[in-house]
Amino acid sequence: MSKIAFMFPGQGSYEAGMGREIAEAVPEAMEVYEAGSEAAGIDLKELCFNAPAEAMLDTKVQQPALVATSLAINQAIRSRGIAPDYVVGHSVGEFAALGAAESIGIPEAIGLVRERGLAMAEAARQHPGSMAAILGLADEVVESLCRKIQNVWPANYNCPGQIVVSGEDDAVGECCTEAEREGARRAVRLRVSGAFHSPLVARAADRLRPAVEKIQFSDPRAAFMSTVTAKLEDASRYRELLIEQLTAPVRFTQAARELAGRGVTVFVEVGPGNVLSGLLKRIDRSVRTVSVSNMSELRELEETLA
């Protein structure tokens, strides 16, 4: 019997009006925004449904808005009787994954992400940096460049031939230049406010720790694939992993391959956009991907699994 994994996107997968159609059609989805707004202390319905996309450039609001939208869409999918065997999240998407797997409550997940966004924004102000996507080089080549240049690190293993690096601005610039000399197809600076998933934001991990340590994690109803370790992890590890992920690279490629190796044949992207689905097609063409961000795509998912 085929297995299903729900994938939850990370920062950058936002869009104006995200989640509105599903929330207005499915009461369980609207309840997520209402509970999340109270937990985060911001009006997530107004932010997601009506604010321009530019409002999401602030990581402090983008993170809770994105996770709330992913969890609202998850509730809509679950209302159709569809449940995953596995969950996996890209960066902040791990908080949505754990909420969807019912290891933590939805308000707790969104409240934690609000604190995470505040912590990351503060760390980025204290120790500025940047990120860039290196396209068309092997992982080993990019890793070697980072070791040689210093103060720049691999941050996201997105798919074969696409690694994001993170670090001090000059070091990231040098890495881009050297990557192109090594034959990279492109080196693209990302529109982010800090050097996330690098040691430069270690203070964010320190600030987030007390909030994470207050949370009681239950055994998940769907197996949790960590993108910190690219392994299945149990509830005893979640606190440390959610703190560690702030400074550790996102091993999405490795995690997706591990899930495919465990028999997952359908990957469902739960959240705005289809970034992860696009990456999956470059990781393993034998699996099926479905993105769900509106009612039409929800119906498509039902047809796919019928």
Q: Model-found features: residue ranges?
A:
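FabD-like malonyl-/acyl-CoA
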Residues: 2-141, 186, 190, 266-299
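Alpha/beta catalytic cores of group-transfer enzymes, especially the acyltransferase/condensing modules
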Residues: 11-14, 38-40, 52, 101-249
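Charged catalytic carboxylate motif
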Residues: 28, 65-69, 171, 207, ...
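Non-catalytic positions within long, well-ordered alpha-helices that form the structural scaffold/packing
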Residues: 78, 180, 260-263
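A short, acidic, amphipathic alpha-helical segment used as a generic capping/interface helix at domain edges
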Residues: 247-264
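Short amphipathic alpha-helix with an adjacent loop that forms part of the alpha/beta core around
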Residues: 301-306
